[in-house]
Amino acid sequence: MGLKARRAAGAAGGGGDGGGGGGGAANPAGGDAAAAGDEERKVGLAPGDVEQVTLALGAGADKDGTLLLEGGGRDEGQRRTPQGIGLLAKTPLSRPVKRNNAKYRRIQTLIYDALERPRGWALLYHALVFLIVLGCLILAVLTTFKEYETVSGDWLLLLETFAIFIFGAEFALRIWAAGCCCRYKGWRGRLKFARKPLCMLDIFVLIASVPVVAVGNQGNVLATSLRSLRFLQILRMLRMDRRGGTWKLLGSAICAHSKELITAWYIGFLTLILSSFLVYLVEKDVPEVDAQGEEMKEEFETYADALWWGLITLATIGYGDKTPKTWEGRLIAATFSLIGVSFFALPAGILGSGLALKVQEQHRQKHFEKRRKPAAELIQAAWRYYATNPNRIDLVATWRFYESVVSFPFFRKEQLEAASSQKLGLLDRVRLSNPRGSNTKGKLFTPLNVDAIEESPSKEPKPVGLNNKERFRTAFRMKAYAFWQSSEDAGTGDPMAEDRGYGNDFPIEDMIPTLKAAIRAVRILQFRLYKKKFKETLRPYDVKDVIEQYSAGHLDMLSRIKYLQTRIDMIFTPGPPSTPKHKKSQKGSAFTFPSQQSPRNEPYVARPSTSEIEDQSMMGKFVKVERQVQDMGKKLDFLVDMHMQHMERLQVQVTEYYPTKGTSSPAEAEKKEDNRYSDLKTIICNYSETGPPEPPYSFHQVTIDKVSPYGFFAHDPVNLPRGGPSSGKVQATPPSSATTYVERPTVLPILTLLDSRVSCHSQADLQGPYSDRISPRQRRSITRDSDTPLSLMSVNHEELERSPSGFSISQDRDDYVFGPNGGSSWMREKRYLAEGETDTDTDPFTPSGSMPLSSTGDGISDSVWTPSNKPI
């Protein structure tokens, strides 16, 4: 409805342009009424204002003309509507109805501060009131003298009359000015303020002073009795300290040292009672003798007399009306005086020191209170600096604040009256310059069209009534209206409104961002200024403040260090176990070998059992990582030992051969060596001495179908007899599916530690008539299974000896033996300890291979190893 009404108003204005002066009368009245009613709802104009707009604009009134006159009717419109158009926000700004009472409130606050919180010039008034009260008191004292009674009475009557008027007016002003406080607003708030103790004192003094002034200096009984009320003016001295600062200071000192005061008063009271009672017992039966020697009544006739004497004596007053007469009483009085006087005088010292400390604290507090205002200004400036960030489009409250503060005086009612008095033409004041038909989207306001002025009925050139400043204000107001219009129409605006405007050289789109940038710059400058002022107030008050700051910083540092140490202790120290070790369940735990027999457990490395809960502290994790690193070091040492063995180039000879058809002599084997078996490079060494063969049951035999056999046993498995080169012929055995053999140990001997008694046999003893059948692939298998050199990095023996774990492998191998069923097996191995090694550094404790079954008690020899399926 609003959009259609504005378009109808625009059409009506277009008709007025086309028809000149007479065309305005030809416009339909219904369109004008609709346009006027719509604009009245939009801009908040009163019906009288709408009539004034109609008379001023005629039938060609459009939206922009109404906007011009909205400035003139701004005050009346704001009084009649609770809402106004937001300047920088897209929503209407709610403005409550306010009276023009800023000056009234300012005066009220000023009077309240002068009477209740006097500072500066207000102290002069309170000093004058104090002199008036003091003068009344002095004159009241002089009236008691007969020689000054008449003169002082007359002056006292005049001064009291003046004081009554002063105090009455002051009390009325106090009641009225109390309305500036929220809790004292309204008549109920005023009654609450009047019930304050000091206000009640003022009322009582005023009521008591009025009868005294009324009766005057008459000599009747009533006037004489009422004159005694003049001394009630002493109570007016209490009103000098209306805020009670003195009493608050004394009360705070007493409360701060209440325990010391109670202790001193308690001990002093006990001393008073005890000394008075003892003196009464001694002096009660001693009569007083006058100068003539006559006996008088006793001085300490009652215990009350003794208490009076004790209080006057211990308070160091000493009237002398009562004194002990006997030496016993004097001795008691002297003893208790030395004790009691110190405790009676102690509260005075406590209060004096407490008051001094409180006064010093108040001075320091006043110095700190000076930081309150700069701190509040800094907080406010920091928030406005943050809220005016152009990227934060959701913060609109600060922009609304500037909308209420930054105001532009648009076309006021006085300006309209001045324009109407000059009898300027309608088109000269409000008609837009751009034609209706042009639908350009330009954002620049152009000056008023002179041609349109020439087309007016008067045909006389009129001066344009808008200067640059007014153009800027009009453009600013147009931008605010555009914001409001876009929010109301939900993004659908009047396309013709973009082409309308007053003469201005500034782009309309850049007007509001420019203003925001200026406000942003001002906020940055104010933030830096308030920050500088606040830093200036942070200067220490005196040397004690500096010492306190350093002490507070030191305590804070110690607390932080203690907290950090506690956190470190919590990290590195394991927590208490939830369940004792002797109560933990051992059910379901798998069998584990002892650490002395397991090849994967070192005896000197402490490891927790599987049943125990692992330590979850940082130190426990460090220990776990250290153990893993040690295991990795052992494995690396083992690999380095293997590398050293295989990189040594040895000249070994083959001691046996593998015949499959018949028998052949060693001479025939030598004859075929050069032409048939020269390319065979097998490394098989015998490190053991000759001896009786082991019984078959002492070997750990594994079936060949479960374990992959060696390359040269895969085709023709044979039995190699134990012995040297003269041990006889080799007898071939037929292959069997149940052939078993004993796998070699995974640990290889260190060749540099071989026994000097080892004998290497000739290579021809191992060669047979079918040795040429060995393929290169089988030859590689023989090389792998016969401990031939590996392609690893070369490490010398010195580096091996410097191994961090001292792990080395020093062992020999026995000769080949034959099993009962044709399988081959390794003989007993002899171990040798290298320099720097222990008995735990030998091959049973290497990190590869499984536990030998001999440790389980199965009757198998310790020299035999179980097959290892885990690669190194």
UniProtKB/Swiss-Prot annotation:
Annotated region Mediates interaction with calmodulin: the residues are: 356-537
Would the keyword Transport turn up in this protein's UniProt record?
A: yes
Topology of this chain in the membrane = Multi-pass membrane protein
Impact of changing residue 340 to V on the protein? In BFNS2; uncertain significance
The residue ranges flagged as biased composition, category Low complexity, are 26-36
Pfam families hit by this protein: Ion_trans (PF00520), KCNQ_channel (PF03520), KCNQC3-Ank-G_bd (PF11956)
Phenotype upon changing residue 574 to S: Rare variant; found in a patient with rolandic epilepsy and additional features such as mild developmental delay and abnormal behavior; uncertain significance
At what positions is Phosphothreonine found? 81, 246
Which residues bind a 1,2-diacyl-sn-glycero-3-phospho-(1D-myo-inositol-4,5-bisphosphate) per the record? 243, 259, 366
| Motif window: Selectivity filter | 316-321
> Subunit structure of this entry?
Heterotetramer with KCNQ2; forms heterotetrameric native M-channel responsible for the M-current. Interacts with calmodulin; the interaction is calcium-independent, constitutive and participates in the proper assembly of a functional M-channel. Heteromultimer with KCNQ5. May associate with KCNE2. Interacts with IQCJ-SCHIP1. Interacts (via the pore module) with SLC5A3/SMIT1; forms a coregulatory complex that alters ion selectivity, voltage dependence and gating kinetics of the channel.
Q: What's the stated role of this polypeptide?
A: Pore-forming subunit of the voltage-gated potassium (Kv) M-channel which is responsible for the M-current, a key controller of neuronal excitability. M-channel is composed of pore-forming subunits KCNQ2 and KCNQ3 assembled as heterotetramers. The native M-current has a slowly activating and deactivating potassium conductance which plays a critical role in determining the subthreshold electrical excitability of neurons as well as the responsiveness to synaptic inputs.
Q: Under which name does UniProt file this protein?
A: Potassium voltage-gated channel subfamily KQT member 3
Source organism per entry reads Homo sapiens (Human)
What does UniProt list as this organism's lineage? Eukaryota, Metazoa, Chordata, Craniata, Vertebrata
